[in-house]
């Protein structure tokens, strides 16, 4: 039976090193002797129910670890469920009861080190690079036991679409990129193609690939991955020259101007490209060469395949001039830089510089790196440099942290959302303190959560000349996951800072030792550092590159991947945190903080769309963006009566509320950049919760409370017997087209909304 281990309990390794005793670390382990027959039956039932329901939802409820934690803590929901028959007759006690039972359930899910574990996956291109890398290096069977493979197959087949392909993410239509690399995964772990039998998933995938022209229609990243494996030719790839990292900072585009995730990914890819590394052929590789293409492998004209991309994959098409540009770069890098004597004078120097960057970034993130995609490429690059090196062994030691097990099977996830989920969870608890007694259970949860925040803040900048190595200031920030990962994010920092400020205002006898005030100042300095001239705030680093550089993007299935941008959600979170900070510490950088808030509020107002919403860059989509935008504006002192932007936002939500009283927005809003309701105008509890909070912040209760009551009725009636909320559609996103799964959102946002609602009802009490 699978068990989730967290923190120091997740196990030690001689090649691991940590900054805070592994706070937030998550590892899945299989114990053949664990679990009673009843527990095993419950897990199997969850698996069957998920597989039977994939035609409706492909997002897991993340039940396996939840079932484990609830058993270990002997959780029992003793508060009866509340059902609201008439939205106009909701009582304060009803809302408070629903909130209380939801909090009791959710507090039982907290890990010993204070964080809330959760899956953070969704893209179907996360797992294959890991498997291909481990296969090439000969470590696949050392990491993936038969039990791992069993769960891996379960997940791959659960995510397969009816037509035989795999989408870019779990709810997407089939695309060549993910279909090819998941097919390769199936073959690597021993699945046979068989015949074109509709019951044979591998055969269905093969047929989809052939019906859509073959693997030459894979986007660039897929082509590079196949080239490394030896089932595609590097000459069929657009260039990823390592010489790029030698460009001076005075050049319009250089390593420092790139979006941080693209930089980390292409750092490893450029090393592989510069080396033209190809795995030694195996019988399987030779078979794949013939299976992936409609024509014989030896007869493929690779030059003609370089700019191919399947229409199903293509989101960011290139113009003729862009194709001409990349052709020129290819001619220069291959005809000149890759030949004697420049291959010795420049190419070798570029490869050495690239590897130095890889090592620096790996060390700075304790070998977690910036995500599962760069992790696989960096790990392979280190193995190519020296298969016996400590660099490679340190990479292997961190692989298990990317593996996640759910009722849908095994998948590779992002580096984790531990900090982000914990900060949002604490908001729901802290905002509701006045509306529920701080009993021992809640108190313990708060103390542990605060302890996790204190342990997770980054306390120093990257070592050495970090600007030269394309790293920015990190001191004072919080990451998306844990301190070891080392990449601070603006909204994670803002939400964590605001929580710490709330804790700062509470008595020490309730929450224990408080955070050093200087560390609060460090967090403020980090947020101030990230603000752009337009008032917005970026996610990871100050905006440096120009938007026109997107013209150079080599990535066909994403948008806005070249440079960093400002984001409405990050800006709204920063305003909320800095406003609270200024109230509690008006003596620290008062002028700078107030200037930040004024400029940031103006930026948010400027970014509002015509219909009154805001585009959400990190969540689905206009409802998500509107929640964080309005929250920021209200924190800045804006109200429905004095701010047209808030009035327009309220009108947008009232116009999109469905007949049931809730809201439901499709992920299709993200790529189309147009509000798209869910099929059948159905409801999603996460978006209903976000919309409900916006209406309350927009003073809707004072004008016409019925829309708010109807939304609250949806949330309260959706609550399950144990206090959980139903898992529905995918809610996270990045770069327009890729969706991320945040299963904890159904709890955090629903509870947060019920907290707002109970506050609003209490104000109406006589």
Curated annotation (Swiss-Prot):
<dbReference type="InterPro" id="IPR032697">
    <property type="entry name" value="SQ_cyclase_N"/>
</dbReference>
<dbReference type="GO" id="GO:0048364">
    <property type="term" value="P:root development"/>
</dbReference>
<dbReference type="GO" id="GO:0005811">
    <property type="term" value="C:lipid droplet"/>
</dbReference>
<comment type="function">
    <text>Converts oxidosqualene to thalianol.</text>
</comment>
<protein>
    <recommendedName>
        <fullName>Thalianol synthase 1</fullName>
        <ecNumber>5.4.99.31</ecNumber>
    </recommendedName>
</protein>
<dbReference type="InterPro" id="IPR032696">
    <property type="entry name" value="SQ_cyclase_C"/>
</dbReference>
<feature type="repeat" description="PFTB 3">
    <location>
        <begin position="646"/>
        <end position="687"/>
    </location>
</feature>
<dbReference type="Pfam" id="PF13243">
    <property type="entry name" value="SQHop_cyclase_C"/>
</dbReference>
<dbReference type="GO" id="GO:0009629">
    <property type="term" value="P:response to gravity"/>
</dbReference>
<dbReference type="GO" id="GO:0051746">
    <property type="term" value="F:thalianol synthase activity"/>
</dbReference>
<dbReference type="GO" id="GO:0009416">
    <property type="term" value="P:response to light stimulus"/>
</dbReference>
<feature type="active site" description="Proton donor">
    <location>
        <position position="491"/>
    </location>
</feature>
<dbReference type="Pfam" id="PF13249">
    <property type="entry name" value="SQHop_cyclase_N"/>
</dbReference>
<keyword id="KW-0413">Isomerase</keyword>
<dbReference type="InterPro" id="IPR018333">
    <property type="entry name" value="Squalene_cyclase"/>
</dbReference>
<dbReference type="InterPro" id="IPR002365">
    <property type="entry name" value="Terpene_synthase_CS"/>
</dbReference>
<feature type="repeat" description="PFTB 1">
    <location>
        <begin position="149"/>
        <end position="190"/>
    </location>
</feature>
<keyword id="KW-0677">Repeat</keyword>
<feature type="repeat" description="PFTB 2">
    <location>
        <begin position="520"/>
        <end position="561"/>
    </location>
</feature>
<dbReference type="GO" id="GO:0080003">
    <property type="term" value="P:thalianol metabolic process"/>
</dbReference>
<comment type="similarity">
    <text>Belongs to the terpene cyclase/mutase family.</text>
</comment>
<dbReference type="GO" id="GO:0010263">
    <property type="term" value="P:tricyclic triterpenoid biosynthetic process"/>
</dbReference>
<dbReference type="InterPro" id="IPR008930">
    <property type="entry name" value="Terpenoid_cyclase/PrenylTrfase"/>
</dbReference>
């Amino acid at each position: 039976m699978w068990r989730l281990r967290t923190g120091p309990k997740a196990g030690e390794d001689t090649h691991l090193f940590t900054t805070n005793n592994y706070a937030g670390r998550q590892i899945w382990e299989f114990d053949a002797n664990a679990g009673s027959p009843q527990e095993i039956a419950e897990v199997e039932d969850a698996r069957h129910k998920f597989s039977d329901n994939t035609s409706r939802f492909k997002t897991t409820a993340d039940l396996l670890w939840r079932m484990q934690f609830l058993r270990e803590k002997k959780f029992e929901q003793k508060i009866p469920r509340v059902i609201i028959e008439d939205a106009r007759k909701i009582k304060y006690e009803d809302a408070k009861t629903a909130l209380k039972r939801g909090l009791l359930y959710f507090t039982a899910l907290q890990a010993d080190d204070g964080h809330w574990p959760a899956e953070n996956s969704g893209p179907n291109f996360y797992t294959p690079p890991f498997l291909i890398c481990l296969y090439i290096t000969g470590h696949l069977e050392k990491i993936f036991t038969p039990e791992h493979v069993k769960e891996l197959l379960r997940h791959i087949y659960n995510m397969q679409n009816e037509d035989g392909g795999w989408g870019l993410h779990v709810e997407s239509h089939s695309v060549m990129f993910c279909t090819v690399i998941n097919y390769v995964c199936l073959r690597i772990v021993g699945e046979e193609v068989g015949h074109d039998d509709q019951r044979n998933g591998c055969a269905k995938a093969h047929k989809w690939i052939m019906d859509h022209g073959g693997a030459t229609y894979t986007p660039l990243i897929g082509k590079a991955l196949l080239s490394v494996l030896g089932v595609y030719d590097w000459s069929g790839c657009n260039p990823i020259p390592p010489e790029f990292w030698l460009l001076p900072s005075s050049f319009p585009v250089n390593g420092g101007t790139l979006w941080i995730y693209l930089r980390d990914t292409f750092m490893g890819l450029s090393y592989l490209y510069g080396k033209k590394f190809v795995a030694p052929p195996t019988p399987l590789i030779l078979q794949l060469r013939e299976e992936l293409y409609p024509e014989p492998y030896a007869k493929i004209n690779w030059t003609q395949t370089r700019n191919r991309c399947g229409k199903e994959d293509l989101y960011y098409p290139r113009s003729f001039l862009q194709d001409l540009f990349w052709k020129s770069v290819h001619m220069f890098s291959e005809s000149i830089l890759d030949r004697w004597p420049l291959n010795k004078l420049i190419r070798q120097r570029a490869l050495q510089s690239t590897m130095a960057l890889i090592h620096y970034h790996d060390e700075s993130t304790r070998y977690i790196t910036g995500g599962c995609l760069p992790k696989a490429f960096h790990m392979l690059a280190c193995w190519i440099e020296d298969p016996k090196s400590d660099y490679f062994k340190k990479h292997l030691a961190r692989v298990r942290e990317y593996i996640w097990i759910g009722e849908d099977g095994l998948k590779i996830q992002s580096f984790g959302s531990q900090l982000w989920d914990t900060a949002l969870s604490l908001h729901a608890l802290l905002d509701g303190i006045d509306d529920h007694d701080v009993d021992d259970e809640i108190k313990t949860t708060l103390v542990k959560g605060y302890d996790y925040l204190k342990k997770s803040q980054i306390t120093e900048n990257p070592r050495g000349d970090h600007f030269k190595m394309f790293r920015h200031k990190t001191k004072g920030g919080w990451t998306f996951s844990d301190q070891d990962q080392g990449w601070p994010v603006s909204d994670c920092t803002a939400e964590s800072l605001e929580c710490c400020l709330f804790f700062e205002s509470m008595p020490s006898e309730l929450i224990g030792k408080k955070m050093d005030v200087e560390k609060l100042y460090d967090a403020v300095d980090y947020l101030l550092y990230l603000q752009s001239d337009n008032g917005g705030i970026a996610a990871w680093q100050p905006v440096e590159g120009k938007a026109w550089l997107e013209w150079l993007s080599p990535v066909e299935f994403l948008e806005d991947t070249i440079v960093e941008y400002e984001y409405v959600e990050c800006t709204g979170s920063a305003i909320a945190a800095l406003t609270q900070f200024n109230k509690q510490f008006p003596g620290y950088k008062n002028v700078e903080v107030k200037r930040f808030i004024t400029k940031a509020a103006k930026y948010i107002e400027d970014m509002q769309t015509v219909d009154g919403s805001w585009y959400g860059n990190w969540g689905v989509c206009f409802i998500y963006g509107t929640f964080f935008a309005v929250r920021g504006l209200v924190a800045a002192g804006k109200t429905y009566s004095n701010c047209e932007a808030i009035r327009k936002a309220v009108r947008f939500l009232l116009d999109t509320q469905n007949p049931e009283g809730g809201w439901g927005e499709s992920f299709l809003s993200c790529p189309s950049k147009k509000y798209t309701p869910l099929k059948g105008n159905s409801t999603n509890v996460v978006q209903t919760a976000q919309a409900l909070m916006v209406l309350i912040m927009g003073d809707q209760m004072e004008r016409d409370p019925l829309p708010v009551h109807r939304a609250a009725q949806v949330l309260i009636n959706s609550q399950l017997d144990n206090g959980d909320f139903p898992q529905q559609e995918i809610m996270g996103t990045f770069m327009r087209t890729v969706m991320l799964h945040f299963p904890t959102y159904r709890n955090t946002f629903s509870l947060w909304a019920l907290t707002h609602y109970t506050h609003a009802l209490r104000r109406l009490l006589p």
